[in-house]
């Protein structure tokens, strides 16, 4: 897994950055 902004956002907990995760991962 590349240590890019996208990767970091995906790995970050949803509770931590729900907004960021939503932007990166479409529901």
Curated annotation (Swiss-Prot):
Tell me which domain of life the UniProt entry assigns to the organism this sequence originates from.
Answer: Eukaryota
What does the entry give for GO biological process? Answer: acute-phase response
| Post-translational modification comment from the UniProt entry | Glycosylated.
The main location is secreted
What GO cellular component entries does it have?
Answer: extracellular region
Q: Where does the record place the region Disordered?
A: 1-27
PROSITE patterns, alphabetically? PTX_2
Report the residue ranges that make up the Pentraxin (PTX) domain in this protein: 6-27
Cofactor: how and how many bound: Binds 2 calcium ions per subunit.
UniProtKB keywords: Acute phase, Calcium, Secreted
Spans traversing the lipid bilayer: none
- Write down the required cofactor(s): Ca(2+)
Q: Which InterPro entries match?
A: Pentraxin-related
Where can this protein be found? Secreted
- Relate the assembly described in the record: Homopentamer. Pentraxin (or pentaxin) have a discoid arrangement of 5 non-covalently bound subunits. Exists as a dimer under reducing conditions.
Query: Which family does this protein fall into?
Result: Belongs to the pentraxin family.
Q: What does this protein do?
A: Displays several functions associated with host defense: it promotes agglutination, bacterial capsular swelling, phagocytosis, and complement fixation through its calcium-dependent binding to phosphorylcholine.
Q: Quote the record's miscellaneous comment.
A: Shows sequence similarity to serum amyloid P-component-type pentraxins but binds to phosphatidylcholine.
- Please identify the protein, giving its name as recorded: C-reactive protein P1
């Amino acid at each position: 897994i590349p240590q890019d902004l996208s990767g970091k956002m995906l790995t970050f907990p949803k509770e931590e950055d729900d907004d960021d995760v939503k932007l990166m991962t479409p529901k």
